[in-house]
Amino acid sequence: MYPEESRGSGGVATVDFLEGTYDYAAPTPAPTPLYSHSTTGCYSAPLDAHGPLSDGSLQSLGSGPTSPLVFVPSSPRLSPFMHPPSHHYLETTSTPVYRSSHQPVPREDQCGTRDEAYSVGELGAGAGGFEMTKDTRFCAVCSDYASGYHYGVWSCEGCKAFFKRSIQGHNDYMCPATNQCTIDKNRRKSCQACRLRKCYEVGMMKGGMRKDRGRVLRREKRRACDRDKPAKDLPHTRASPQDGRKRAMSSSSTSGGGGRSSLNNMPPDQVLLLLQGAEPPILSSRQKMSRPYTEVTIMTLLTSMADKELVHMITWAKKLPGFLQLSLHDQVLLLESSWLEVLMIGLIWRSIQCPGKLIFAQDLILDRNEGTCVEGMAEIFDMLLATASRFRVLKLKPEEFVCLKAIILLNSGAFSFCTGTMEPLHDSAAVQHMLDTITDALIFHISHLGCSAQQQSRRQAQLLLLLSHIRHMSNKGMEHLYSMKCKNKVPLYDLLLEMLDAHRIHRPVKPFQSWSQGDRDSPTASSTSSSGGGGGDDEGASSAGSSSGPQGSHESPRRENLSRAPTGPGVLQYRGSHSDCTRIP
């Protein structure tokens, strides 16, 4: 305890203690304490109840400094002696005055001068705040401050370095969620897959800084224009690096000729970047099945995953450069002819780094032994694993994979007769042009691998020859899936069912009439046409009773009905039935 003594005018010492009761001695024989701990903050006696104060017993802190040893309790009102209504005791002038009013307190009330800091918020919301950020650039990926114009867009040092690392060599980023993670300044490191996807979406490209394409001159010209443009043009300036990418991926409202000219002017390296940016995410089955798997559980898991992947496959196809410029008929025909091949090459690509296993989803990894519980599945598993092993030996690059995947889709128009519709492409020249563009991009990538000309040609042939094996596996898988459908062992979802029926529907009347005229000679088709669908194999005979009439009574599919979302039932139907199981001869 540290007492502090002071002499009043009457010569009586007043002692203030840091602990215990606080006694203010009066000039009486027996000084009485005015308050204690129990009455602190709740004593409300009037000021004149104890008589006038002596001059030395208590003084206002406004008239002189207090000792640093005096303990000041935190209660707002100690007693009428400490806080009389007319004045604030134990308060220095530097302490802010707290009032119950909601109006802001000007600093003139306390210090006599106005504090300039109170107007910072007002200036920040006005013209002064804009002047501070007028020349500030933000990263197009994470919205952090941009350090420069990197890879075709304004970006920060972190996103620039991340994109540089990602485009060098093989990367297998996988999103742990739904490939829709938020990428900003604070969460840009949480998901590499979504960060790389956003880099492609905002227009980052590998050749964005190449001088031989004149990009440096265009960038300098753009910077010069930015300094002369008013503030209202700043959002357009930040989006300008994406103009070329938007023109290449224009919507279906653009005419076919415009889309074709944009493909002609698109360099191969940009085509590769667009193909990589269009890749769908790796999905999760989100179904918990106990092991060991049975035939029903495995087929349920696989058909459910296939239906989910079909939705993402349609989104992927729409992102291919020039695909939306095709007619709706051609888009549907290409997807119907190649959907299982596209899913299979994606499965093979995911399984390259895991020998002996097939990665259907992040939480659905099967080996060859687990596929033996399904009749006929082990053979398909063996072919998939063999193709994955071949790609592993060739050290398939991501750029080569996206090119092969797009080639499968576009080249399927030449085999559209497999769907049974016998309808040719409306604009086969546009499809062939897209196919040539992507093939050129594949050749461009192989030419930059540092191999000799002979090795480049050999590698290109080796990659393209593997596509025939994938088509063979697709046919096997289609047969197996269709047999599962006819046995009614597993439920098939709408989109998967429609895609499957597109390969198994009866052939329309007009193609058989053209065959009878000698345009297309096929003994099997002629016998089938003459028999009216009743002379097929056992499977066709078993389903003849479920048909609503002879084969000639079936109508050709109406493609105009496909303008709605592909997930609805009845996209490709004959008399609204999905029960036709007739095998195509």
UniProtKB/Swiss-Prot annotation:
GO molecular function: hormone binding; nuclear estrogen receptor activity; sequence-specific DNA binding; steroid binding; zinc ion binding
Basic and acidic residues: compositionally biased ranges: 210-236
Region (Hinge), start-end ranges: 205-266
Subcellular location: Nucleus
Region described as Modulating: 1-138
Keyword entries, A-Z: DNA-binding, Lipid-binding, Metal-binding, Nucleus, Receptor, Steroid-binding, Transcription, Transcription regulation, Zinc, Zinc-finger
Record-level GO cellular component terms: nucleus
Pfam families: Hormone_recep (PF00104), Oest_recep (PF02159), zf-C4 (PF00105)
Domain called NR LBD: residue spans: 267-503
Keyword DNA-binding among record annotations: yes
Zinc fingers typed NR C4-type, residue spans: 139-159, 175-199
Low complexity bias spans: 541-553
Purpose: The steroid hormones and their receptors are involved in the regulation of eukaryotic gene expression and affect cellular proliferation and differentiation in target tissues.
Similarity remark: Belongs to the nuclear hormone receptor family. NR3 subfamily.
Notes concerning its domains: Composed of three domains: a modulating N-terminal domain, a DNA-binding domain and a C-terminal ligand-binding domain.
PANTHER family: KNIRPS-RELATED PROTEIN-RELATED
Protein name per the record: Estrogen receptor
